[in-house]
Amino acid sequence: MNNFIIATQLSLDHDIASFMNKLLNNFGSFLTPILKFITILGNFGTIFIILSLLFLLFTKTRKAGIIALIALLIGVITVSITKIAVSRDRPFFDTNSDFYSWWLQAGAVKESSYSFPSGHTTAATEFGVALFISKNKKYSWLFLFIPLIMGFTRIYFIVHYFTDVCGGCLLYTSPSPR
């Protein structure tokens, strides 16, 4: 059973990366600069930390800022521990794989830590969910697109497997005071 699960996961990761490579080949001149900008914004969670700190300045957004900062702190610790515990190599690590050639085509964005879970996606999920739970419910569901877009960029550049991104979303832990 365990081998079946691993084979299914690897097949899913490969199929989704293959699809991303097709997107790159067909729409890369349009998509790549936009997605590169988005993924750079997510480096070290910097944009999410800055926005959370800005939210602290205003009474109306202070709750969202506090929730987001706490979630981001928990996320950094959890992601760091999980990356070491799982020790999954990046998709491009095996130079004889499709992933490696796709990574080169996508611009060979360099990443040095382990792959699972996606730290960018975890931070984006923490930030998006923090805003979701602390804002007007009528429109707050739009904040949930933040992790989807960030996760998409990480798979597009072949720096993460699809399952790394899913892990980043699922790993999210919220202090969620309501």
List the model feature ranges, each with a label.
Residues 102-174:
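Membrane-embedded catalytic cores of phosphoryl/pyrophosphoryl-handling enzymes
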Residues 176-178:
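Positively charged, low-complexity/disordered segments
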Residues 1-48, 81-109:
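N-terminal transmembrane-helix/juxtamembrane module of multi-pass inner/ER membrane proteins
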Residues 58-59, 87, 158-161:
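Short helix-capping/hinge motifs at transmembrane helix termini and TM-loop junctions
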Residues 47-50, 165:
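Transmembrane-embedded, aromatic-rich helix segments that form part
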